Every structure is written in C-alpha cells, then in structure tokens.
Amino acid sequence: MIREKTNKISIIGAGFVGSTTAFALMQDGLASEIVIVDINKDKAHAEAMDLAQGAAFVKSVDIKSGDYADTKDSDIVIITAGVGPKPGETRLDIINKNLKIFKSIVPEVVKYSPNSILLVVSNPVDILTYITYKLSGFPKERVVGSGTVLDTSRLKYMLSEHFDIDARNVHTYIIGEHGDSEITAWSLTNIAGANVDEYCKTVCANCDGSFKKELPEKVKNAAYEIINSKGYTNYAVALAVTRIVEAILRDENAILTVSSLFEGQYGIDNVYLAMPTIVDRSGARQILDVPISNEEKENLIKSAEILKGHIANSELD
C-alpha cells in the first residue's frame, strides 16, 4: 500500500496570529501534523489542546505543542513570534526587539528542519525575512515573507465595496514594503479585463478617481485602526498565511505578493520586498518582472532604500 505523503507544519509563536493560523490551517485540511512552539509552553499547550479537541470536525490532523525538537522534519515552519506594534508604533519601530527573538529562533529551526521552507509573518516582515535569510543560510527560494498578500486582499475588498462587485473579480497588487512605504500598483489593476480607470467610467457617472487616493491610505492604516480598537490583528493575516501555505504544499505556481529577495529586478538588490511572485513547492520560485509605471518603479526603489537603511541600522551583525 502506497501511503500519501504527509505534510508537517510547525508554527513558532502561539500568540493571536500563530494560534489563529493553526486554526485556519486545520480548517483547510492542509497539514497532517501541526506543531505549536512558544516560549510560554503553557500557552502553546492550551492552544494545541483547544484545537485538537475539535478534531472530529475536520480532516485528520495531529495537533500538538512542543519544543524545537518536536518540529523535526517540518515541511514548512511559520514564524509568527515576536512583539507587535503598540498603539502609536509602526512596524519599523520594533525591528531590534524582534531581531533578538529571531536570533534565538532561526538556528533552532534550521537545526531540526534543514530542508524546510521558512515562512516569516512577524513584523516588520520584509526586514525579518531578510534577517531570517541571513541567519538560516537557506537558498532564497526557501525563505519567504508574507509580504503584502494581506494588503492586496484589503485593497481588493475595498475596491469590491467601492464598485459593488465580488472581491474575487478584482485583480490588483500592493507592492514593496508591508508598511507605510507600500505602493498600490494601479497600472496592474483591472476589473473584467479593463483597467480600473476605464472600468470606473463605465459603471460610475461621476468617476473622479478620488478612490485612487483614498483607498491606498485606508489599506495602510487598516492594521493600525484594528490594533487601536482591539489590540491586535489575527483573522485576515491567518487567512493570508494559509493561502501561501496552500500554494506551496499544492505546488500551485500561484502568483502572490509574497516578500522575496530582489537580485537586480527593477534595479533593486539584496533586500526583501513584496512583488508578484510565482509560489510553488520550492517556495518563492520567481519574482515576475511585470510592467509597472515609472512612478511606481521610483516608489518601489524608495521603499527598498527605506528598508535597507533600517537593516543597516539594526543589530543584525
């Protein structure tokens, strides 16, 4: 009897994002084994127990907590551990706090799962993904950040609300940093095959284009608005992470705006940024050299320089 290959996923961090991601993965039936690791072992144990007791309602999955040794031979290791921005802080304000945490996490993950794909979710995600790449010694394809997959979903949702259509029929991308310097790629935005400006003219008698100024700011501020009200974000980001995991494990060749290592694309080098990228079983297979506008390219380069500056001033070395 030939047994189907099992998929083992480990999640480092049992906070709001980590535990909700475990729930989303469990619901989606992507993994046969999920291991949750956290410095607070009681918290990790409780989250795993709570999830495991719903096993009768989902596809067969073994959910448990443990230490790094229990993550051995994981296919994907998702890193959600770290401190999040407090009200009034930006993602970039917490670099060195999370860098210290990552210096303790990444070597342990690499030790036990040297062939895994590392999926970084903790913020600032682009910088921490670059740091993970440097600390792990893994090939660039196997170190992936969640990038702007969530931001892109937020924009699709907002455009769908604006035009009163299904979000799945909106095609657009947020590129660059997952943060304040991110760029809305309006040049790549289309609905029903029509550029968003042309589509707007066909459905709106008074299309002044103001949404192109308003919605990007709403996307940038969405997380801060949620954090100010409930203290954290967890649901949408967990769904975004699950979508990335799905693309990897199912070898989809899906195009997602994950954070990938730039090596000369658009004149940018040696920094992780979000860009439409082919995601398959190898991880982030290829950044697509899509035709963005000159203004978008200039802003992408500025975004890269901002991140490089923060990396240079970090305590990486």
From Swiss-Prot:
PANTHER family: L-2-HYDROXYCARBOXYLATE DEHYDROGENASE (NAD(P)(+)) (PTHR43128), L-LACTATE DEHYDROGENASE (PTHR43128:SF16). Belongs to the LDH/MDH superfamily. LDH family. It comes from Clostridium perfringens (strain SM101 / Type A). Beta-D-fructose 1,6-bisphosphate binds at K156, H171. This is L-lactate dehydrogenase. Signal peptide: none annotated. Pathway: Fermentation; pyruvate fermentation to lactate; (S)-lactate from pyruvate: step 1/1. Substrate binds at R91, N123, P124, V125, D126, D151, T152, S153, R154, T233. Catalyzes the conversion of lactate to pyruvate. InterPro entries: L-lactate/malate_DH, L-lactate_DH, L-lactate_DH_AS, Lactate/malate_DH_C, Lactate/malate_DH_N, Lactate_DH/Glyco_Ohase_4_C, NAD(P)-bd_dom_sf. Allosterically activated by fructose 1,6-bisphosphate (FBP). It catalyses: (S)-lactate + NAD(+) = pyruvate + NADH + H(+). The keyword NAD applies. The lineage of its organism: Bacteria, Bacillati, Bacillota, Clostridia, Eubacteriales. One of its GO terms (biological process) is glycolytic process. NAD(+) binds at V17, D38, K43, Y68, G82, V83, S104, V121, S122, N123, S146. Homotetramer. Pfam families: Ldh_1_C, Ldh_1_N. The keyword Cytoplasm applies.
